Amino acid sequence: MYIISSKNMLLKAQRQSYAVPAFNIHNLETMQVVVETAAELRSPLILAGTPGTYSYAGTGNVVAIARDLAKKWDLPLALHLDHHEDLADITRKVQAGIRSVMIDGSHSPFEENVALVKSVVELSHRYDASVEAELGRLGGVEDDLVVDAKDALYTNPEQAREFVARTGIDSLAVAIGTAHGLYTAEPKLDFERLAAIRDCVDVPLVLHGASGLPDSDIRRAISLGVCKVNVATELKIAFSDALKAYFLENPGANDPRHYMKPAKAAMKEVVRKVIHVCGCEGQL
């Protein structure tokens, strides 16, 4: 079984004080590079897709490609639903073989968030799928969701304790000052808050918006309980910058088998760096 739940890999990371990287995928090349590099480094791996990614590529196609790559590289991996909000959509995707779910009800009032998350937990656990939920809101842009900085709310540690207990989630995404997309100013993470959250809950913690963070901040967050680190924008920038540079040098190029090579090489360097920072190399 090559498409697995992320629950056990995150619990192992929690016990051994490293983090599992979750790379957002957008096309075939992204999936190829991420799986190949993780396999070479014997790193646990989560492939994450937003609703927009699954809509763009087709859920069945994503599942089939992920399964084929995992088998080719002998790398069991978690295929993850990132920032999903609709129960019916989640149900279809879990039934299609996906075993890792992030239900995002962070835009809703607390009681509504709890109710939605509980319903997703009840569904997902019937299929042995793990569930991540977010408490608090990150600023920035993720897929079609835009959260202004003034609307971003940090996670309350005591509320996190209640949230985890009432929902039965397997991991908790925390808001401590990160943001989706590119940072317009130097991020200042609330590590004191993160430590307090860790002391209030026993599930692995998740850090969204890691692209652009200093390596030292990521390592410190891992030391304070973060077991899953999400990376999206950094991969997209590496991919697109390499493509742009190739076409500037080769304006007549038209063969994707050629111009995708430098783009894949650029992404590979990002994946290697993230795995190194997460401390998960050789943890399979």
From Swiss-Prot:
Gene that specifies this protein: gatY
Its biological purpose: Catalytic subunit of the tagatose-1,6-bisphosphate aldolase GatYZ, which catalyzes the reversible aldol condensation of dihydroxyacetone phosphate (DHAP or glycerone-phosphate) with glyceraldehyde 3-phosphate (G3P) to produce tagatose 1,6-bisphosphate (TBP). Requires GatZ subunit for full activity and stability. Is involved in the catabolism of galactitol.
Entry EC number(s): 4.1.2.40
Binding site for dihydroxyacetone phosphate: G181, G209, A210, S211, N230, V231, A232, T233
A Pfam family: F_bP_aldolase
UniProt cross-references to Gene3D superfamilies, sorted A to Z: Aldolase class I
Protein name: D-tagatose-1,6-bisphosphate aldolase subunit GatY
Cofactor binding annotation: Binds 1 zinc ion per subunit.
